[in-house]
Amino acid sequence: SGGPGTGKNHLAAAIGNHLLSGGHSVLVVTIPDLMLRVRECYDGGQSEASLLDDLCKVDLLVLDEVGIQRGSSGEKVILNQVIDRRLSSMRPVGVLTNLNHDELLGALGARVIDRLQMDGGMWVNFDWGSYRKNVSHLRIVK
């Protein structure tokens, strides 16, 4: 958890790249993109069950931008299903969010937060300022 630009995605990418180099599968998906994929299921694309199976097959799933939409009930159900299935299968899931613990608890519910803390799951605070202003390729050249 942490504000924008604090390195949450950077750390998740480093972990993912390390796993990929060892032959593991990794999927990083934003919640808005995931919910778009779920809506596409209703329009006759992939079945929702098949989508959930795909999300549960990868060795590491990272859910990004959790809580950015302040969770509809449908979003809560999907996230609950994904997290529940992955943890029941002993497969890790990373959650990246700008929300603090209490805000995420409100967005996802106590059941999901409790499950995420099972088997050594931990909350990591990125409690420093944004680093983006220091990144040269993002600066405007005049």
Across the structure, where does each feature detected by a protein language model lie?
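Walker A/P-loop nucleotide-binding motif
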Residues: 1-12
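Generic detector of contiguous secondary-structure segments
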Residues: 11-15, 46
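Short glycine-rich substrate-engagement loop in P-loop NTPases that contacts/grips substrate
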Residues: 20-57
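Walker B motif beta-strand of ABC-family P-loop ATPases
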Residues: 60
